[in-house]
């Protein structure tokens, strides 16, 4: 199969036929879901071998999504990163505003191939929910989105977008009322309605085949970026950097660079209020191997093996697990993972906005914060590629409250402007 954008199963790279990435992955699900998950695996294998599937997906990615996404050098931002050159892979410019549409269109096509008429999905920041609702509108599929009640409040704009697109949005009020609980409810729905429903899983976690399938639909990010940075900079980057929650945007960027051992693959996890506070979602930094949502990976858990509640200012990173391929990359030493606090991410968000006129999603801002530190380590000869996984429209209320940007917070806003002036002065 020849395809410019859909390039599954790179030769010689994991997973195994059983869905394992080293010791991680697999399929740990209730009996009621075995047939449905196996059907997804079988149909996906057929789709990978079907040139028409690749042709249709390529057409959607070009003419509907707007691929290839741009590669933007951010020179003023880079002045604060030790003078290293910094390039952004602009997934924020995709239709719906993030990388999520890549995977959603692929799975929507698969849903149609399976003859299913209804799609369910989980969402944290709302970007996967918006992308899913968009694809369902395009394909004429019924759509139900599960979203933690806390996330519906801090991402109210995306809730409105989903409903405008025709989706039913169900606020999950159990547990921590965030992404983990939305996934739990979506799995319950799938068990009850498996005959006509496909669970359009939004990240590279879950039972096999979802980690590999979602990765394959996102590989286009790294394939494009690798070609683009060679054209723009004349060489491969020293580091490819992405935020990590479940891990889909990061693995999409990383995968094309795995054979390039001179390229460091660096994921930036949410450290929340700080690792020492316990209020974070830094799974690879502070977690232990365990089973969550159908696969074995690193999980945030207590001494008795119970899942602990994650925290992040970013709704899209607020997850106590991680995709099994990231666990494999960590343990093999091929991937590096750092924890970034809320404060560091928000400062990076503001810095990119003020120096480049690009407002990133809070999720992506974690990667930007990481890039600032990595650039200082690499120095002026360094070259950094950052995946800007989404735009920040959805986060404006959070950012405005954090920085005091509303008129009622004028004194706080003045302090924020003063801080930026001081930062810019330090860089000169």
Swiss-Prot record:
Protein name in the entry: Tryptophan synthase beta chain
Transmembrane regions listed in the UniProt entry: none
Matching Pfam families: PALP
Keyword Amino-acid biosynthesis annotated: yes
GO CC terms of this entry: cytoplasm
Coiled-coil zones: none
Role this protein plays: The beta subunit is responsible for the synthesis of L-tryptophan from indole and L-serine.
Taxonomic source organism: Streptomyces avermitilis (strain ATCC 31267 / DSM 46492 / JCM 5070 / NBRC 14893 / NCIMB 12804 / NRRL 8165 / MA-4680)
Similarity section: Belongs to the TrpB family.
Catalyzed reactions per annotation: (1S,2R)-1-C-(indol-3-yl)glycerol 3-phosphate + L-serine = D-glyceraldehyde 3-phosphate + L-tryptophan + H2O
Gene3D superfamilies with a match to the protein in the record: 3.40.50.1100
Enzyme Commission number(s) of this protein: 4.2.1.20
InterPro entries: Trp_synth_b_CS, Trp_synth_beta, Trp_synth_beta/beta-like, TrpB-like_PALP, TrpB-like_PALP_sf
Assigned keywords, A-Z: Amino-acid biosynthesis, Aromatic amino acid biosynthesis, Lyase, Pyridoxal phosphate, Tryptophan biosynthesis
Keyword RNA-binding set for record: no
Assembly with partners or alone: Tetramer of two alpha and two beta chains.
N6-(pyridoxal phosphate)lysine: residues carrying this PTM: 100
Molecular function, one GO term: tryptophan synthase activity
SUPFAM superfamilies to which the protein is assigned, alphabetical: Tryptophan synthase beta subunit-like PLP-dependent enzymes
Required cofactor names: pyridoxal 5'-phosphate
Pathway in which this enzyme or protein is active: Amino-acid biosynthesis; L-tryptophan biosynthesis; L-tryptophan from chorismate: step 5/5
């Amino acid at each position: 199969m020849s395809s410019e954008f859909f390039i599954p199963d790179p030769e010689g790279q994991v997973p195994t036929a059983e869905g394992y990435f080293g010791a991680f992955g697999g399929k740990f699900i209730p009996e009621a879901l075995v047939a449905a998950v196996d059907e997804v695996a079988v149909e996906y294998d057929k789709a990978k071998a079907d040139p028409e599937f690749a042709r249709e997906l390529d057409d959607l990615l070009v003419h509907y999504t707007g691929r290839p996404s741009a590669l933007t050098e951010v020179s003023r931002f880079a002045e604060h990163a030790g003078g290293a050159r910094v390039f952004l892979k602009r997934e924020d410019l995709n239709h719906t505003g993030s990388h999520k549409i890549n995977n959603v269109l692929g799975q929507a096509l698969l849903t149609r191939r399976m003859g299913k008429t209804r799609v369910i999905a989980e969402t944290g920041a709302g970007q996967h929910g918006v992308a899913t609702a968009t694809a369902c509108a395009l394909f004429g599929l019924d759509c139900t989105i599960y979203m933690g009640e806390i996330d519906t409040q801090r991402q109210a704009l995306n809730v409105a977008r989903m409903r405008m697109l025709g989706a039913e949005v169900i606020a999950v009020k159990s547990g921590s009322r965030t992404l983990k609980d939305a996934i739990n409810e979506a799995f319950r729905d799938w068990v009850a309605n498996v005959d006509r429903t496909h669970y359009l899983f939004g990240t590279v976690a879950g039972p096999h085949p979802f980690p590999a399938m979602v990765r394959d639909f996102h590989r286009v990010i790294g394939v494009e970026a690798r070609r683009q940075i060679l054209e723009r900079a004349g060489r491969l980057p020293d580091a490819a950097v992405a935020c990590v929650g479940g891990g889909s945007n990061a693995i999409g960027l990383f995968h094309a660079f795995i054979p390039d051992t001179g390229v460091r693959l660096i994921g930036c996890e949410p450290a929340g209020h700080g690792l020492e506070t316990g209020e974070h979602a830094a799974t690879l930094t502070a977690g232990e191997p365990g089973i969550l949502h159908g696969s074995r990976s690193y999980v945030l858990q207590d001494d008795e093996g119970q899942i602990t509640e994650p925290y992040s200012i970013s709704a899209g990173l607020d997850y106590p697990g991680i995709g099994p391929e990231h666990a494999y990359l960590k343990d093999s030493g091929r991937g590096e993972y750092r924890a970034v606090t809320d404060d560091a991410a928000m400062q990076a968000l503001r810095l990119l906005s003020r120096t480049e006129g690009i407002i990133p999603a809070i999720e992506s801002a974690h990667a930007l914060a990481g890039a600032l530190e990595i650039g200082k380590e690499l120095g002026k000869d360094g070259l950094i590629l950052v995946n800007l996984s989404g735009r920040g429209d959805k986060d404006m209320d959070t950012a405005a409250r954090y920085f005091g940007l509303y008129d009622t917070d004028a004194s706080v806003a003045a302090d924020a402007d003063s801080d930026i002036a001081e930062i810019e002065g330090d860089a000169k």
